[in-house]
Amino acid sequence: CSIAVGMIIEIIVMYPIQHRKYRPGIDNLLVLLIGGIPIAMPTVLSVTMAIGSHRLAQQGAITKRMTAIEEMAGMDVLCSDKTGTLTLNKLTVDKNLVEVFAKGVDADTVVLMAARASRTENQDAIDTAIVGMLADPKEARAGIREIHFLPFNPTDKRTALTYLDGEGKMHRVSKGAPEQILNLAHNKSDIERRVHTVIDKFAERGLRSLGVAYQEVPEGRKESSGGPWQFIGLLPLFDPPRHDSAETIRRALNLGVNVKMITGDQLAIGKETGRRLGMGTNMYPSSALLGQTKDESIASLPIDELIEKADGFAGVFPEHKYEIVKRLQARKHICGMTGDGVNDAPALKKADIGIAVDDATDAARSASDIVLTEPGLSVIISAVLTSRAIFQRMKNYTIYAVSITIRIVLGFMLLALIWKFDFPPFMVLIIAILNDGTIMTISKDRVKPSPLPDSWKLAEIFTTGVVLGGYLAMMTVIFFWAAYETQFFPRVFGVSTLQRTATDDFRKLASAIYLQVSTISQALIFVTRSRSWSFVERPGLLLVVALIVAQLVATLIAVYASWSFAAIEGIGWGWAGVIWLYNLVFYFPLDIIKFLIRYALSGRAWDLVLEQRIAFTRKKDFGKEQRELQWAHAQRTLHGLQVPDIKLFSEATNFNELNQLAEEAKRRAEIARQRELHTLKGHVESVVKLKGLDIETIQQSYTV
C-alpha cells in the first residue's frame, strides 16, 4: 500500500507539476518498486520455518503443518492426557492390596486369572504389569490351551480369554474396567456397594482399579454365552508420575501455558495425580461439562468459565475432549490437545495444535499437527520454547521488512520530489541483493524466546516498522541536505565537496547515498531482533559474518566503483569514513525509539519512560523479566503454587476490607503450604511404590 501511494504521489508531482522527462520519472518509480517490495520475505519466512521444523524434529516433535509452529508459539492452554504423558505408563500392582470377592479364591488366583486374560505378546502396559507379577510369565498359559482371545476395545473396555484346562473343560476369564466387569457378574446387586467402596479407596491413593471375572463354559463352544460370571477380585494399578512432570508443569506455568489434565480415570485419581504433580486439584467430572453435576458450588457457574478455570477433568470420553477444545477456543484461547486413540481424532483435528503422543494410532497421527516421537510432557514444553524462538525470528524480520519498505519509499520519494534527485535503479537492486542475502541468515539467528505466548500483533509490527522506517528516511534526507546544500562535511572533516553545482550530474552523491542507505539498512536488523539494547543481545555468528561481508562489498563499491551504466562515481575513503560515522551517531537513537514505541503501545508510555525511567534502568534487560512474568505469576497464584506478593489495597481501603484481604491472604498461604506438603508426600509415596516397600511402615518413619 505504501509503495502504491508513493508511486502515485511521484507520478502526480513529477509529470503534471514538475514536467519531468519520461525516462527519469520511470527510473524513480523503479527505485520505489525494486527497493520497496520485500522480495526476500517469502523465502526468509519459509526457510526460517523449515529450519525450525527440522530443529523440532530433532527434539522429538515432528511437524506435519508448518503453520502449527506459529500457533504453538501462541498456545496458552494445553490439554494433556494423564497416562503416558504426565505419568510413566509403567504400571505396578501391589499384591498385598488385592481385594478378593469370591469364596475359595486368594490373591494369587486373582493375579493368575488376570494374567490369563492378558496378552503374552505385543503387550500393553497393563498386560505387562499383570504378567510380570508371575514368577514365570509362562505360567499365564501353563496347563491350558487358548481357544479365543478378545482384545481390548474402547467400547467393551475389557479383554477376555476362552481356554480349555487339562481336563478338557472350557472356561473364560475377563479383566478390564471395574464397571464393565461388574456388569457381567450374576451377583452384581450383592457386591456393587463393596466394589465401589474399594474403588474409591484405591482412587484416593491415586490407584486405578482393574476388575477380574471368571465363568465356566459347559457347552464347550467359544460362541456360547457360558455360565454365570463370578466377580473374583480387584487389582490396584499404580502409574507413577514422570520424574520431570512436576518441574515441567512449573516451567509451563512460567511460560504462560496453563496445563489441564484430561483423563478417563476417576476424579479422585485425577485429583491425587494433580496433587502429586503440583498442578492443582481444581478438577471436575465429565458430567460437569454437560451441566449435570450435583455439586452446588459449581452448578451455577457457566460451563465456559468452569472449563477455563479448571485444572482438569476426569472420566472424560473423546466427545468430551472435543467439547473442551471448542469452548476454550470460544474464549479466545489458543488450545493444544494431546491424544493417542482413534476416538481422539475429532478433538485433535479441532484443536489449534493437535499433538499425537508417542505410540499413537495412525488415525490420531493423521488428525494431528505435531507427532511426538518421545513420551512425556517435557518434549511438548521444549517444542513450545523452540516454536517461540522460530516465531521471534519471523517477527523480527517482518518488522525489519516493513521498516525498509517505508524508508525506501519515503526517503527516495522526498529526494526525487524536493531536489529532483534521480537515484540509479541499478544501485537499489544492489542494495536489495546485499540486504536480502544478509537477512537470509536470520533463520539461524540466536534469539531469546518470548516468556509469554506470542502472536502476530499487527499494530505493534506496523507501528514499529513505520516509525523506524520514517526515522531512517529522515536520516537520509538530512544527510543529502547537509552534503548537497551545505559545506558542513568538507568544513568539519576536510573531504571534497558534493555541494550543488551548475553542471551537477549527482554521480558522487549517488555513491554517497548508496553507502549511507545500505549500511544503516542492514544495521537495522540488530535493532529489530533485540528486546533490549541492540548491542547487549549477542547475535548469531552467521548473521555477523554475512553483515561484515555485505558491508565490506558496499563500502568498496562506493569508494572505487565508477560505473557509467549505473551513473555512480567513487567517493574515496574520506567520504566513506564520514558516512560510517554519520550512521553510527544516528544508529543509537533507534533503540530509544523502539522502547518508546513499545511503551506507547502498552498503554503506559510516559509514566514508564519519564517517571520511572524504565528505559534507562540498570536492571538486566531493563526489568523485562519482572514485567513479562507478572502474568505467569498470577497464574501460579491461582494454582496455589505461591502466595501473591502484589499490593492488594490502597491507602483508602477501610478496616473491613483489610480484614477480608488478610483472611484471603492467610487462606491462600495455607493452600500453598498444604499443596507443597502434598506434593512432597506424593513424591515419597511414588518412590516407595516403585521400590516395592510397605507404605504403612514408611509412613510411620518419616514426617514432613
UniProtKB/Swiss-Prot annotation:
Q: Which family does the similarity line name?
A: Belongs to the cation transport ATPase (P-type) (TC 3.A.3) family. Type IIIA subfamily.
Catalytic residues at 81 (4-aspartylphosphate intermediate)
User: PROSITE patterns under this entry?
Assistant: ATPASE_E1_E2
Full protein name: Plasma membrane ATPase 2
Q: Which keywords label this protein?
A: ATP-binding, Cell membrane, Hydrogen ion transport, Ion transport, Magnesium, Membrane, Metal-binding, Nucleotide-binding, Phosphoprotein, Translocase, Transmembrane, Transmembrane helix, Transport
Q: Where in the cell is it found?
A: Cell membrane
According to its UniProt entry, the function of this protein is described as: The plasma membrane ATPase of plants and fungi is a hydrogen ion pump. The proton gradient it generates drives the active transport of nutrients by H(+)-symport. The resulting external acidification and/or internal alkinization may mediate growth responses.
Oligomer status and interactors: Possibly exists as a homodimer or a homotrimer.
What more does the entry say? As many as 6 to 8 closely related genes may encode other isoforms of plasma membrane ATPase in tomato, like the LHA1 gene product which is 96% identical to the LHA2 gene product.
A Gene Ontology biological process noted in the UniProt record is: proton export across plasma membrane
Query: Cytoplasmic face: residue ranges?
Result: 49-395, 446-461, 529-540, 592-704
Which species does the entry assign this protein to? Solanum lycopersicum
Q: Which InterPro entries match?
A: ATPase_P-typ_cyto_dom_N (IPR023299), ATPase_P-typ_P_site (IPR018303), ATPase_P-typ_TM_dom_sf (IPR023298), HAD-like_sf (IPR036412), HAD_sf (IPR023214), P-type_ATPase_IIIA (IPR006534), P_typ_ATPase (IPR001757), P_typ_ATPase_HD_dom (IPR044492)
Entry GO MF terms: ATP binding; ATP hydrolysis activity; metal ion binding; P-type proton-exporting transporter activity
One Gene Ontology cellular component annotation held by this UniProt entry:
plasma membrane
E.C. code: 7.1.2.1
